[in-house]
């Protein structure tokens, strides 16, 4: 009799919603609102960009779509996905101000940024490089004296580019832009001589261009850029969901 009573009590306990783990932080907010907001950069191929129909797409966007599926499983409900475009200099504030729930793009994980946001496991590794027009082959550091080099402001590439110029005593001018698109437009119009960004992004830009053979990309890199997705600080449960998805994808070899 006592054994039967114990079994009944266990069934009641585990059937009680209060016995289940309570949702907290971002997961709780997503279930309550019924939506998840994905922050992304609009011109950072192949990580995040707009397709021909104006829809967000890319490697990081695909990762975040997989995370959304796992979030739905975790909270036991379907959610609406809202894509929120962000800039390089406004992306972390968008997270801290609760305007987005996760940052999916080409964001480098650094210690200083970890004071502002939390990062997932690494999603990609690249390095900063240089792009020029093919009729201008001064893309090696030795040929940049007197040149103008464009870079997106509030990026690690901007920091590393200025460091490179300082340490090698190159007489080059750094020109800051709000986006990769603005930088490429300036390069095409020859307002700058080169554009510096993460090498994988430079390759993505060239591949997507209507005239990919017009660009020259330096073989070398001058920085180490480990990419990761970003979430709000001290939200371990939500970050764990994202980390689990990323880990499972790598183990499954769906991404290499």
Residue spans of the language-model regions?
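Ligand-binding clefts/hinges and TM-proximal coupling segments of bilobed small-molecule sensing domains
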Residues: 20-24, 31, 156-175, 213-217, ...
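Periplasmic-binding protein-like
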Residues: 42, 124-133, 199, 206-247
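Acidic, polar ligand-binding/catalytic clefts
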Residues: 65, 69, 76-143, 213-221
